[in-house]
Amino acid sequence: MSGTSKAVILARGLGTRMRAESGGAPLDAGQARVAETGIKAMIPMGRPFLDYVLGSLADAGFGKVCLVIGPEHTQVRNYYESEAPLSRLSVEFAEQARPLGTADAVLAAERFADGGTFVVLNSDNYYGPSVLGELNRLEEPAVVGFARSGLIELGNVPPDRVKRFGALEVGPDGFLRRILVAPNEAMLRSGEEIYGSMNCWLFDRSIFRACREIAVSPRGELELPRAVQLAIDAHGLRMKVIKVRAPVLDLSSRTDIAGVHERLRDVEVSL
């Protein structure tokens, strides 16, 4: 079978923004209780938010999932080992002992990847099956570049948050050149659509070398975008950019919960 069938979900984050109180955020008791733990993937929206992410993967053709979690995340492990009604997906776990960053989280899933291609996604973002299907059909490294206008107009991401997302510098051949902290002057002057990363990646095994070689960032983390840039600059990685104008539902803080829940209310989930 051609294409990519494995997905790694990064669910180890501390959830600092989710744990912080957001005055007036309309949460029910169950949502408030889980928000206090910071485990965004398990925020209840009729069912855990992560179920919607996994259901979208299954709809897109993926069959094997690895959840990267911390040793303390027993709620996640217990649910997907014993309670979740899995019929289309197999779910494994990889433990990231300490929250050292997204590149370190990817390294935790190396055994699961087993030398093949795999996608990497955030556990607090909902990507539609049409977007994930683009990656499912590929067998070479790629990143989905989301049009900033689409994130604002079609998703739930406010403009001030979009400005904090990195921008993708894409060559005329359609491959990634650089991941920028912010759009450069040339991008802004051009008036053309700016595409950003929402951590929707397709990797092969070459990414693991780069994840091991990068230095700790000024934020004190081993960051996946820095590993990608190192792989491009030093190892000759060619990463295709798939440009889309599509929504992403971003579950960053308590103020996002009600809106995301409403958007997902009619989404049917089959795991």
Where are the predicted features?
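Conserved N-terminal catalytic core of the sugar/cofactor nucleotidyltransferase
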Residues: 1-37, 43-120, 219
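Conserved alpha/beta core of the MobA/IspD/sugar-nucleotide pyrophosphorylase nucleotidyltransferase superfamily
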Residues: 2-7, 179-271
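Conserved beta-strand segments of alpha/beta enzyme cores
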Residues: 41, 90-92, 175, 238-240
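A structural signal for short hydrophobic beta-strand segments in well-ordered beta-sheet cores
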Residues: 42, 168-170, 241
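Phosphate- and divalent-cation-binding pockets in alpha/beta enzyme and binding domains
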Residues: 52, 75-78, 130, 227, ...
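Short, surface-exposed amphipathic charged segments that create phosphate/polyanion-binding patches used
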Residues: 105-112, 156-162, 255-259
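The conserved acidic donor/metal-binding loop of glycosyltransferases
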Residues: 123-126
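Conserved core of the sugar-phosphate nucleotidyltransferase
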Residues: 128-209, 214
